[in-house]
Amino acid sequence: MSNKMWGGRFTDRPDAIMEEINVSIDVDRHLYAQDIAASKAHAAMLAAQGIITANDAKNIGKGLDTILSEIGAGKFTFKRALEDIHMNVESRLAELIGPAAGRLHTARSRNDQVATDFRLYVRDVLDETDAALAAFQFALAERALEQADTVMPGFTHLQTAQPVTFGHHLMAYVEMAARDRGRFQDARKRLNESPLGAAALAGTSFPIDRHATAQKLGFVRPMANSLDAVSDRDFVLETLSAASICAVHLSRFAEEIVIWTSPLVGLIRLSDKFTTGSSIMPQKRNPDAAELVRAKTGRVIGALNGLLIVMKGLPLAYQKDMQEDKQGAMEGFAALSLAIRAMTGMVRDLVPEHDRMRAAAGEGYATATDLADWLVRTLKMPFRDAHHVTGRIVGLAAKQGLALHELPLAEMQAVEKRITRDALAVLSVESSVKSRTSYGGTAPKNVRAQAKAWLKRLEKERKLG
């Protein structure tokens, strides 16, 4: 005869392999706080509706508080034989308060119970991620304001393209993080409905108040369809999707840090706090933190892909496949959290090599577009013609191994006789970045204004939050 809490129907014990594949406590034990909170809300509602007595609800609440304290203090023994967090908590509750513990599961199934727990868990993840990204943005904006005048090369195809400011580059990631936060915040809005009370799939015949439990747990409303409530994990998928996009942004920045810290490039330095050495090469300073951020992106994207594959063929309602929704997601969320914190630390730590940045900004004829723009503005030349003329001038300079501003004026005039000495003034990298005053451009005054605006906005969020 089965000794399981669901075992009344069964006459034989599960096979040992069945026990092994069925158990989930190693993963869902991380839902203990959410499980206890949902159970307390459910018990209070049952009493308010006259389904259980007020005294039973009181004892259930006290017992659950004791269990919460035991788990928090590391004094709770999780038992694999009890399968999951729900049964572990209920079993311990029975030890503490006796038969009244058996009334807790009235009008509830593990199907709506776990859906509620996981929504609460993911909601906490969303809030923590939003706060971490806000701190990342603040660090970026602070450094951007500090480095608003620092000229560096801007790249396309990893080739020098046009001069930009380091502050402008950092502010690009502030904007990306803002969109990431928007996606997480939007996901939270759709997540924030309560499955509790949907029971196994069809609802319950007991006169429960789902609005009361939803309100108690901070949800906006109960989910409107009991089948939907227990059978979908789109809230996890949406969060992992937003997490994957965010991780890609972090990975791109991490890749830049890896490139920029290479002695062959040398645009920035990281301190010993975010680098490691080699076991054989004593001179090495490796940007391991950035490399690991880059790698952890795969963990996040892998979690999304894994859950998509789990869910893609499941008919309604609950299927045991959905027990596999948590481990990958939890690992993905943890990887993203660590990556955000590591990138925030590196942003605060990195030191720009100003001289090297300035020199690199002028390499590769990076101010050629400024010359083309001068031809358009001053000589009223169509841009396509100006592009062609400038390309010929760049070719002359390259053939002689000269920077653009080093090419004699006479040779420029051999290509376009109307070019004057005034054109030389636009060829410095400082002049180039200062001229990019269009909205969103790299001009230092733009960067300062944007960085200050973001710092003010983020500080206001801190005070309100």
From Swiss-Prot:
Pathway where this protein functions: Amino-acid biosynthesis; L-arginine biosynthesis; L-arginine from L-ornithine and carbamoyl phosphate: step 3/3
Transmembrane segments: none
Top EC class, one word: lyase
Cellular-component GO terms for this entry: cytosol
Localization of this protein: Cytoplasm
Alphabetical UniProt keywords: Amino-acid biosynthesis, Arginine biosynthesis, Cytoplasm, Lyase
GO MF assignments: argininosuccinate lyase activity
Keyword Kinase attributed: no
Organism domain of life: Bacteria
Family named by the database record: Belongs to the lyase 1 family. Argininosuccinate lyase subfamily.
Designated name of the protein: Argininosuccinate lyase
UniProt organism field: Rhodopseudomonas palustris (strain HaA2)
Source organism phylogeny: Bacteria, Pseudomonadati, Pseudomonadota, Alphaproteobacteria, Hyphomicrobiales
Gene name of this polypeptide: argH
